[in-house]
Amino acid sequence: MRSYRELFRTPEFTPFFLASAAQGGALTIGGLALATLVYRATDSPLLSAVSMFGPQLAQMLGATFLLSGADRLPPRAALSSISLAFAGCTLVLALPGLPVGAVFGVVFLQGLIASLGGGVTGGLLNEILPKDGFVLGRSVFNMVFGLVQVVGFATGGALLAVLSPRTCLLLSAALYATASVVLRLGLSARPPRSSGRPSVSATWRTNALLWSSRPRRLTYLGMWLPNGLIVGCESLYVSYDPGAAGVLFSAAALGMFVGDLSVGRFVPPALRPRLPVPLLLLLAAPYLLFALRPGLPWAALIVCVASVGFGATLAQQERLMALTPDELAGHALGLRGAGMLTMQGVGAALAGTVAQLTSPGSAMTAMAAASLTVTLTLAAAGRRQVRDAEPVTAARE
């Protein structure tokens, strides 16, 4: 499958796509509104960053206890219920006078719910599409999320100029509720991919199985660490330039769209395995220029160019699926998403802490340097793994 026409002719893909777009819009508008609300209340870059990316901090806890449900729950019911739960949480965040501590409690709950949703979504996409359509389909999902971010952050910034953050949160809740309805009406009822009831013990067993393979471990770490550190840079856009954060987020989303389009549509399958390291280096290196405190036009250009590097995730997910049994696809993708989002939350907290002690520009530079170091270290570990495997292969022959 190489064309978008074939992709959208696949039964159920279109409503799945539309619901994902609505959820992306809700996430971007609501996240920007919440970060703005917290920053106005606290004047803290750390709390602003964590409020926007804080749900990610709960992802790994959810992956530890809930992720077996990704393959053991009916996908349609699970996804529509998750979107409805997000609508409810966002309504709570919009309540006037909600204490900051309660805000972070709701944000933590959203992260737990999202840890299950990522696995169900990835597993269902793998089920709806044929094997040769997974990367193209995943790229479309990533691209629409990027486009929705461009529109969502631009719209969110414009809305915040004329409406209160709480009103924007209400709009976000309405989008989540709409997505829930689309999922319920647009998807077919399917049985779970794996037998048995979701449980903590089943989650732990499958996590241990997935983590037992060294190639999978390196693939997971490559998806989690460099990405998470750079999202720490993104979490500082509000404190770097409070009046133009929407422009920077939109520039990042545009770069992400270009990266996903290029990797998913134009790069030959034989070339994709070589892309992750160069793209991850591209993701981090431009942020070093924030040491110069660039103004808005240059900052937006830097962010856009760097975000092309997020296209590495498509090649990494394709490798993960090649290393994973089909019946564990949802769990494997859920663990990937939970770990990635957890590290994004850690990156946001770390970047916010450094910014609190120094400045947002200095913190971005430090996070970029850390991401480059991690990418080069993992690349060296991958080369050692290949060299170690070659004598074993030769001996068997």
Name the predicted role of every residue range.
Residues 1-14, 188-221, 397:
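Juxtamembrane intracellular "pre-TM" segments in multi-pass secondary transporters
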Residues 45-46, 131-141, 326-336:
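Loop-to-transmembrane helix entry/capping segments in MFS-fold secondary transporters
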Residues 106-147:
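Cytoplasmic helix-loop-helix junction between adjacent transmembrane helices
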Residues 127, 169, 173-197, 380-392:
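Helix-loop junctions on the cytosolic side of multi-pass membrane transporters
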Residues 21, 25, 29-33, 163-170, ...:
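A single, central transmembrane helix in multi-pass transporters
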Residues 21, 89, 100-116, 297-311:
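Hydrophobic core of transmembrane alpha-helices in multi-pass small-molecule transporters
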